[in-house]
């Protein structure tokens, strides 16, 4: 009898690692292909197909070397251990699940932010209640699909890992150190992917003028981990744009302001100035109505969609800024600009940063010291985005949030409706006026936020279905009209300066390094004695708090570098932070764009076509852009953004 013995071929101890590297390379390449096909017009517009996939595979190898380099090393040394084999299976499975989960989450993130998941993805994870409520209300089917697919992937990966670790041949102990050294070298070179002074980073593989296409080169897992790693460097975040001596930085910033040196009153606080208000009567109340995501695209009188009949009418009664630009794309960036007049940086907004939780200048702090009641009125929960901590620590005496509303007319994912918010504001202001107390209040809306929930029957829908961005913007306008009907009949109307301003635009994105169109926002100052006018000067959100103080008759010392627009000045500049890219635009529409670890580039912005065209700009303009980009980080790091007074 002939007996045939068949034996399974024994695999290298590193076979499981190679298997999962190959699987993940395929998954990431297929995901990138799908995303590229989805965004094919934008990829083709920058002739990016070859670069996208060549550099994409390179970045995937980088990510996988980081992810599997350590287990590869430990497997080389301990593959004979049953305990290590179990740990290896878990590492391979959960590492791969993380990769595929991030890719599954990518289309929805791009749909909203026009970019692969980045630091915003991490920041939102801090607030699971709000985020999960939003997802459940507006994106339930996508959430269910993602969860089911991720669980299925986890099961499949676990089974594959079980198959991959079977029948591994043992490596002699003499050979193990040699192979381990080889693994270290290969993993290090693969992760670094460069023989230059710096290892690879997203800036090195950016090749186009379209920020989204550049982000497609990355994979979403790498993008998020890289963003998380950047958090620890926030104090010096702006240095990624270049370096400049502090004295030169302040010289350039001061020169751009055009103010005499005698206005600067402190050696310790370099931007601290004395400021005399234009209005010299009895100081007025100040109310900032900060509108969630209400960009110029939603305002008819600014050339946007016909969604704002109330703001359009109010614009005929007040001081409308036609050419004002937001400093960023997040609410906290808008808060930073409108309450502190602080320049943007690539770090998180100061609302979230540790060293700004007390002793950081805001106009609330200045006004509180001058006897004003200061408040923040919000329809959601005050802890979101760290707002309560920042406000309480920097001059805001009272905070009203969702728990303070008795029997609201409507409550959605992000809190009570804007009508409820404005009813609370009107009630609060009436009470304070009766008590004879001057007041400052920041009133922050939330109805114009995904999943776009607002009361029925309030507006004629612009489109179907009801829960759309455009309909929510129209409701936000309706609620503003509701507030001003009450305010004009109130006891506080004649004594108050109002500012309607957006925190940022909605769905900021586009086929350019910085989508300038989507930084254009409305700003409208109203109140008794405000002369109606349309102001075409190029201005920034950071010019609003200085202007409000002057209109209200509040003089004082403060470190804000924004212009007082009641005076005969022309700021002729706007600063825009788009993730880690910053733009400075001048009144002639010339733009300097600064990206991490790259030389500043000049462009011209064509408003009619909404495009950026490369252009040589003066070195002086590039230096001005760099000085302002570095300023915020320097002042924050050295705790120099203060009125110079002890509380």
From Swiss-Prot:
Keywords: Cell membrane, Membrane, Transmembrane, Transmembrane helix. Its main location: membrane. One of its GO terms (molecular function) is transferase activity. GO terms for cellular component: membrane; plasma membrane. It is a multi-pass membrane protein. It is found in: Cell membrane. Gene3D superfamilies: 3.30.1120.80, Alkaline Phosphatase, subunit A (3.40.720.10). It comes from the Bacteria. The chain crosses the membrane at residues 14-38, 61-78, 90-110, 140-158, 178-195. This is Uncharacterized protein HI_1246. It comes from Haemophilus influenzae (strain ATCC 51907 / DSM 11121 / KW20 / Rd).
């Amino acid at each position: 009898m002939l007996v045939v013995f068949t034996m399974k071929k024994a695999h290298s101890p590193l076979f499981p690692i190679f298997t999962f590297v190959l699987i993940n390379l395929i998954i990431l390449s297929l995901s990138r292909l799908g995303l590229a096909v989805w965004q094919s017009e934008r990829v083709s517009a920058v002739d990016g197909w070859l670069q996208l996939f060549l550099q994409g595979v390179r970045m995937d190898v980088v990510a996988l070397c980081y992810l599997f380099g350590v287990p590869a090393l430990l497997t080389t040394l301990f593959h004979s251990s049953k305990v290590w084999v179990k740990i290896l299976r878990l590492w391979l499975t959960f590492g791969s699940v993380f990769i595929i989960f991030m890719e599954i989450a990518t289309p929805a993130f791009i749909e909203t932010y026009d970019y692969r998941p980045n630091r915003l993805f991490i920041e939102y994870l801090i607030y699971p209640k709000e985020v999960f409520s939003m997802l459940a209300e507006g994106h339930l089917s996508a959430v269910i699909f993602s969860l089911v697919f991720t669980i299925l992937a986890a099961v499949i990966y676990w089974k594959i890992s079980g198959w991959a670790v079977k029948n591994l041949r043992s490596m002699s102990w003499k050979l193990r150190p040699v192979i381990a050294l080889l693994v270290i070298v290969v993993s290090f070179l693969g992760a670094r992917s460069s023989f230059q002074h710096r290892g690879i980073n997203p800036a090195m593989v950016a090749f186009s003028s379209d920020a989204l296409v550049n982000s497609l080169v990355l994979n979403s897992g790498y993008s998020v981990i890289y963003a998380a790693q950047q958090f620890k460097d926030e104090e010096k975040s702006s240095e990624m744009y270049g370096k400049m001596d502090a004295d030169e930085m302040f010289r350039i910033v001061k020169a751009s302001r055009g103010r005499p040196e005698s206005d600067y009153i402190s050696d310790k606080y370099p931007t601290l100035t004395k400021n005399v208000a234009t209005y010299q009567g009895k100081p007025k109340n100040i109310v900032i109505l900060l509108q969630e995501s209400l960009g110029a695209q939603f305002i008819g009188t600014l050339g946007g969609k016909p969604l704002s009949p109330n703001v359009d009418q109010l614009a005929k009664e007040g001081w409308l800024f036609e050419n004002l630009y937001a400093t960023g794309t997040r609410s906290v960036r808008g808060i930073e600009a409108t309450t502190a007049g602080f320049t943007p940086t690539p770090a998180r907004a100061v609302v979230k940063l540790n060293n700004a939780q007390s002793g950081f200048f805001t106009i609330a702090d200045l006004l509180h010291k001058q006897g004003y009641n200061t408040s923040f009125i919000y329809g959601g929960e005050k802890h979101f985005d760290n707002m309560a901590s920042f406000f309480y620590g920097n001059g805001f005496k009272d905070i009203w949030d969702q728990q303070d509303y008795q029997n609201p007319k409507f409550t959605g994912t992000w809190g009570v409706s804007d009508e409820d918010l404005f009813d609370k504001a009107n009630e609060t202001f009436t009470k304070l006026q009766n008590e004879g107390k001057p007041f400052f209040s920041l009133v922050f809306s939330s109805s114009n936020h995904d999943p776009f929930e607002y009361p029925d029957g309030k507006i004629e829908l612009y489109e179907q279905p009801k829960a759309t961005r455009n309909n929510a913007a129209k409701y936000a306008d309706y609620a503003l009209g509701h507030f001003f009907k009450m305010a004009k009949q109130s006891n506080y109307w004649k004594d108050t300066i109002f500012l309607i301003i957006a925190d940022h635009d909605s769905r900021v994105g586009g086929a350019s390094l910085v989508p300038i169109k989507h930084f254009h926002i409305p700003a409208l100052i109203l109140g008794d004695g405000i002369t109606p006018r349309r102001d075409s000067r190029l201005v920034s959100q950071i010019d609003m708090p200085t202007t409000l103080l002057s209109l209200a008759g509040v003089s004082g010392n403060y470190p804000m570098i924004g212009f007082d627009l009641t005076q005969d000045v022309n700021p002729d500049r706007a600063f825009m932070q788009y993730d880690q890219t910053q733009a400075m635009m001048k009144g002639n529409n010339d733009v300097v764009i600064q990206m991490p670890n790259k030389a500043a580039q000049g462009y011209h912005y064509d408003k009619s076509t909404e495009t950026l065209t490369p252009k040589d700009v003066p070195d002086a303009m590039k230096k001005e852009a760099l000085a302002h980009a570095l300023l915020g980080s320097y002042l924050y790091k050295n705790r120099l953004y203060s009125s110079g007074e002890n509380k």
